[in-house]
From Swiss-Prot:
Cysteine pairs bridged by disulfides in the record: none
Classification via NCBIfam families: gltX_bact
Catalysed reactions, as listed in the record: tRNA(Glu) + L-glutamate + ATP = L-glutamyl-tRNA(Glu) + AMP + diphosphate
Keywords, in A-Z order: Aminoacyl-tRNA synthetase, ATP-binding, Cytoplasm, Ligase, Metal-binding, Nucleotide-binding, Protein biosynthesis, Zinc
Cofactor remark: Binds 1 zinc ion per subunit.
Name assigned to this protein: Glutamate--tRNA ligase
Species of the source: Geobacillus kaustophilus (strain HTA426)
A GO term from the CC aspect: cytosol
InterPro entries xrefs: aa-tRNA-synth_I_cd-bd, aa-tRNA-synth_I_codon-bd_sub2, aa-tRNA-synth_I_CS, aa_tRNA-synth_I_cd-bd_sf, Glu-tRNA-ligase_bac/mito, Glu/Gln-tRNA-synth, Glu/Gln-tRNA-synth_Ib_cat-dom, GluQ/Sye
Biological role stated in the UniProt entry: Catalyzes the attachment of glutamate to tRNA(Glu) in a two-step reaction: glutamate is first activated by ATP to form Glu-AMP and then transferred to the acceptor end of tRNA(Glu).
One Gene Ontology term from the biological process aspect of the record: glutamyl-tRNA aminoacylation
Length: 490
């Protein structure tokens, strides 16, 4: 590309990083890195009443956690700042005045009540999509001066050209056409409080920051003609647009922040012990697909392969099961030290282990986490997975009860119990040898041998490697559970 690629992700600090925002940020990032360009994070904080405390910090921290190492923002000046819209108000004012002077914009003194009456009258007349009548468009300079002298509040509206067609090429959708009559009439570019509206400020920012490409959600598609009007009035070249398809839930309904069937914020996945590299991989496949069947890719591979022509034109389903599966694939290959960092805090938080562990307790916890590395889908899952190690008395699953009711069980368990009592040291290797001895003594092997022992000491018929699980349970607990299984009637 001849022009340097500069993209932007522009979150509002009215909330934390949502999965939809994360996907948008990621596609901007992949495109920029693929073309050797720059990614800018601009904070669109003009909706002051809705901004939440810590929202800005949370957005940036979660982007960095995901591995989106942007080039310019409020914490990384690149010479195109300020990067907060509330710090750019003087800049917007300059361009608003230019439009007023050129006659492309005007002051509107209509009150909210007058505007509502206008809309109601249009609806009563059968107009489905009411438009602003433009009555303040024709005020004379003298009338404007008089209304201002009376202290009447006003907004500033952009004059919408009549009978004009706006056409642009979208990198996802191809040719898109809008008519000027469909934007709702002359629209507000500056609110009564002096703050510019989104569709005006975003054009000024994108132009001055030399943004070359805009990747954003399809909900912004209807904003595009308004923005093109501003570009045209200033004689500026607009960026190339790519409107990403909706993210839908498993019922194929548009993802709503009120939908409690899906965890929707990146920080929540982080708290649950998901891995950033797995989340990065998953988000990359949410509306984009590489060639072939492979689904696990490193960040560098995704950057190298990213091609806008493979962005989907259909809604993307947020498949929680797939994310959990993908995270498990990453956990299986994870360095044990990092897995311990991920999972151990959850055992402490659940009260399973003390915060100030001894070296012996820490080693035991490390061995426990290693035992479940293949099964664990996310860090917090260690708590339910390992529950049997912390219970005083286990509950037997139905399948375990069926196994323990088999006729060979008393002989297997009593023989194993005798071996366990004498076992020193109580290690996985010694336990393996003891189970082998039970096989020799009872003639039982395979499931008839292992299943009763597993069912008796864990209450389950499936689980981690048995000799290691028995070692971690400890001799005393194993003896208690074997004795109970021999006494209980199944």
């Amino acid at each position: 590309m001849a022009k340097e690629v500069r993209v932007r992700y522009a979150p509002s600090p009215t909330g934390h990083l949502h999965i939809g925002g994360a996907r948008t940020a990621l596609f901007n990032y992949l495109f920029a890195r693929h073309h050797g360009g720059k990614m800018i994070v601009r904070i669109e904080d003009t909706d002051i009443e809705r901004n939440v405390e810590g929202g800005e910090k949370s957005q940036l921290e979660n982007l960095k956690w995901l591995g989106i190492d942007y080039d310019e923002s409020i914490d990384q000046d690149g010479g195109y700042g300020p990067y907060r819209q509330t710090e750019r108000l003087d800049i917007y004012r300059k361009y608003v005045n230019e439009l007023l002077e050129q006659g492309h914009a005007y002051k509107c003194f209509c009150t909210p009540e007058e505007l509502e009456r206008e809309r109601e009258a249009q609806r009563a007349a059968g107009i489905a999509a009411p438009q602003y009548s433009g009555k303040c468009r024709h005020l004379t300079p003298e009338q404007v001066a008089e209304l201002e002298a009376q202290g009447k509040p006003y907004t500033i509206r952009l004059k919408v050209p009549e009978g004009k067609t706006y056409e642009f090429y979208d990198l996802v959708r191809g040719k898109v056409v809008f008519e000027s009559k469909d934007v709702g009439g002359d629209w507000v570019i500056v609110k009564a409080n002096g703050i510019p509206t989104y569709n005006f400020a975003v054009v000024i920012d994108d132009h001055l920051m030399e943004i070359s490409h805009v990747f954003r959600g399809e909900e912004h598609l209807s904003n595009t003609p308004k923005q093109l009007m501003v570009y045209e009035y200033f004689g500026w070249e607009p960026p190339q647009f790519a409107h990403l398809t909706l993210i839908v839930n498993e019922q194929r309904k548009k993802l709503s922040k009120r939908d409690e069937s899906i965890i929707q914020f990146v920080s929540q996945y982080k708290e649950l012990g998901y891995l950033p590299e797995a989340m990065f991989n998953f988000f990359a496949l949410l509306g984009w697909s590489p060639e072939g069947e492979e689904e696990i890719f490193t960040k560098d591979e995704l950057i190298r392969m990213f091609d806008v022509s493979r962005l989907s034109k259909s809604p993307s389903m947020f498949d929680t099961k797939k994310l959990t599966w993908m995270n498990n694939q990453y956990i299986k290959k994870l360095d044990l030290d990092r897995l311990v960092e991920l999972a151990l805090p959850h055992l402490v938080k659940a009260g399973r282990l003390p915060a100030d562990m001894t070296d012996e307790q820490r080693q035991w916890a490390r061995d426990l986490i290693a035992l479940y590395q293949e099964q664990m889908s996310y860090g917090a899952e260690i708590v339910p997975l390992s529950e049997l190690f912390f219970k005083e008395e286990i509950d037997y699953e139905d399948e375990a009860r069926q196994v323990l009711a088999e006729e060979q069980v008393p002989a297997v368990l009593s023989t194993f119990l005798e071996s366990v009592r004498e076992l020193e040291p109580f290690t996985a290797d010694e336990i393996k040898a003891a189970i082998k001895a039970v096989q020799k003594a009872t003639g039982q092997k395979g499931k008839k041998l292992f299943m009763p022992i597993r069912a008796a000491v864990t209450g389950q018929t499936h689980g981690p490697e048995l000799p290691f699980a028995i070692q971690l349970l400890g001799k005393e607990k194993v003896i208690e559970r074997l004795e109970r299984a021999l006494q209980e009637k199944f």
